[in-house]
Amino acid sequence: MRITIDRANVSVEDGKVIIDLDSAQLENILNADKVQLSTLKPKDEFKIGDEVFIVLEQSDNGTKVISKEFAYTNKVFGDCSDWKESPIRTLLNGDYYNKIAKLVGASNIISMKCDLTSLDGLDDYGTCNDKISLLSASEYAKYHKILGLKSNYPDWWWTITPASTPSNDYFRFVCYVGSNSVLYWSGCGHCNGVRPFLNLEPSILVSL
């Protein structure tokens, strides 16, 4: 990277070279190793802070991404299969959201409408709006090839999709991705990993 500085902005004081930079020049230096998120393709990786994310999709509505590693491990889904009641949802849209918002700006995290339709097609739980969520089972199917086939994950990880719902006398079973990348379901009291799913403003600058 090359920055042109007017000689008038360079001085020597006590044997030290002093360079006066304007805000644009300073910004160029600070962002020298960053790229605009919109330039990345599905499967590309980038960093927010010390966390690595994978680009899943670029669209007019934002850039959908997922954490490469588990942000949390051994997390219980909750007391039932309704994502709206899950302590993981509270965690992601509380402490975790605050951490990411400090790094990218709150206005650059785009709210998502989450479909809580069960694996067997029941809509008891409706929808909800989240700043940060988990993939649904259908979203996992959509992005499976991007995330990788025959993956070997260190643990199982949750989706937001219930296996069925109370109208079918099932209220405790939730879909998860197994360590072999196959979709299964288990009781909501089990402990699995958490991979945050976000929709970001494509114009933000990110590190590779």
Regions found by a protein language model. Name each.
Residues 2-208:
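Collagenous Gly-X-Y triple-helix signature in extracellular proteins
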